[in-house]
Amino acid sequence: MRYLTAGESHGPKLVGILEGVPSGAKIDKETIDQALQERQKGPGRGGRMKIEKDQITILSGVRGGLTTGAPIALEIINRDWANWEKIMAWGDEADLESRKVMTPRPGHADLTGYLKYRTEVRNVLERASARETAMRVAIGNIAVQILEALGVEIRGQVLSVGKVHMDSEDTPEYWQRVQASEWKVGDPKGEEALDAQLQEARSQGESLGGVLQIQVRNLLPGLGSYVQWDRKLDGRLAQAVLSVQAIKGVAFGMGFTAGQHFGSEVHDPIGYDSGRGYYRYSNNAGGIEGGMTNGEPVIIEAVMKPIPTLYSPLSTVNLETKEVMEASVERSDVCAVPAALVVLKHVAAWEILQAILEKFPADTWDELDKAWQDYKRFVSEQ
């Protein structure tokens, strides 16, 4: 499978094309729209989210609620385009002077993109913007729906925002609280501290980052491969996660703390039970060993840096005069960590489904489902 996206933050539309999805898979448009709406939510979001009401339009590749095997084309309308139509026009009528950006923002693609592509900063930031992730959520939700039909579950939580760290557990009640929380946390006391921290950051013109966790459950062992470097599933998941705007680090299982322990404290002892087959007594590896799933939940943690646009701007250099000035201010969020969690779940889902289709090549949903169930039976009998 593969996909491409196109579109600018303030252009008329975001578009996506994906191919390689088996035919006959059930796809529900409302479920995609719900994921898009979830991405728009969360404390700390900016004024743009009050303008947009993201919904997907399926242009091809799905008929009667089932994939056809043809490329799937998608689009999302940018409602804010109405306010930028003259500025973002493609022809000679474009107003190139209004909203021109001459003071690049530290931490953003502005300056480096300006140097690399020899184009205006406006053109750089329009494509580098995290607005692009709306389409990646839509594309990834197609993968989510197929994975769920196979019995695979993807969940996530926010572990920390700024200096506030959450107490985490793994019970049905806890995950219900996470799902109901605007912050996507299961710690009520922590949620109160997050609200207070957000108000402090907003009053100071600051922004906030955080640490997020994704869990992928009910995967069979053997997805990915140790045979070549580019087939290792943890490497591919890491690349997908790090490709999301503002994500600066990724870890699996124990992550970087593994370097602080003896090997006997890190590696997961193997057990066997006639009912469940082989299993691990712990999951410090985060569900991946040798680049392959081992049957335990895949646990991914990622760190999101604070958003580069600050309402109390840092210093920068004017591209024309070379004078030191304050960086430009674009309309932005104070905190988008819960929204980033939605994006990470969906980019991870795409990589997981791709790994499944590499192990079980299939042109149709029925072929994929049969291969998955046959292998599941084989694993349980070993």
Curated annotation (Swiss-Prot):
Its EC number is 4.2.3.5. Pathway: Metabolic intermediate biosynthesis; chorismate biosynthesis; chorismate from D-erythrose 4-phosphate and phosphoenolpyruvate: step 7/7. Gene3D superfamilies: Chorismate synthase AroC (3.60.150.10). SUPFAM superfamilies: Chorismate synthase, AroC (SSF103263). The keyword NADP applies. FMN binds at residues 127-129, 245-246, 290, 305-309, 331. The keyword tRNA processing does not apply. Its cofactor is FMNH2. GO terms for biological process: amino acid biosynthetic process; aromatic amino acid family biosynthetic process; chorismate biosynthetic process. It catalyses: 5-O-(1-carboxyvinyl)-3-phosphoshikimate = chorismate + phosphate. InterPro entries: Chorismate_synth, Chorismate_synth_AroC_sf, Chorismate_synthase_CS. Reduced FMN (FMNH(2)). Homotetramer. This reaction introduces a second double bond into the aromatic ring system. HAMAP family: Chorismate_synth. Belongs to the chorismate synthase family. This is Chorismate synthase. It comes from Desulfitobacterium hafniense (strain DSM 10664 / DCB-2).
